[in-house]
Amino acid sequence: MTSFSRILCVIDPTETEQPALARATWLAKRTGAALDLLICYYNEYLGGEWYSDSTSLQKTRADVLEGLRERLEILANPLRADGLVVATTAVWYHPMHQGVARQAIALKSDVVFKDTHHHSALSRSFFTNS
C-alpha cells in the first residue's frame, strides 16, 4: 500500500452522512496517517460583498465558523478515541475548490477525500457546483 502521512477530508456541513470521512478514516487506520478534517464554508449574505463589511457581519462569520469547528470536533472525538491523530479546521473561503486546494497545499496533504453529489444536466448547465 502507498505510504501516506497526511490525509485531508472535506466535510460537507449540509449533510449528516459523511461517506468521504468513512473512506478517509479507513485509509488513516491502515496507513497510520494523520487525518485533517476541513469545512470550507461561504455564505453570500454574510460575505460582505452586498453590504458593507461591518463589525456585526465579521462577528456573525466568526460565530458561524466556531459552530462549524464544534461540529468538526464532534466528528473528530470518536476517531481520536480510536487512536487516530485528527486535526480540525473551518475556514471562510469562496470558491470552495480554491479553499480546499490552498488548505491541501498548506497542510502538505498526500490525498484529499471529498463527497460528490449528482446534479442534473439542467442544473449543471446553469450552475457551478463543487
Predicted regions and their residues:
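Small/aliphatic-rich secondary-structure junction motif
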Residues: 1-56, 80, 87
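Structural beta-alpha unit
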Residues: 1-2, 77-112, 119
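Structural motif corresponding to alpha-helix initiation and N-cap regions
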Residues: 18, 94-98, 128
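Generic structural signal for helix capping and beta-alpha/helix-loop junctions
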Residues: 45-47, 96, 121
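Short, hinge-like loop/turn segments at secondary-structure boundaries
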Residues: 53-56, 105-107, 130
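A short acidic, glycine-rich active-site loop
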Residues: 55-70
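Glycine-rich, Arg-bearing micro-motifs that act as flexible, cationic patches
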Residues: 111-130
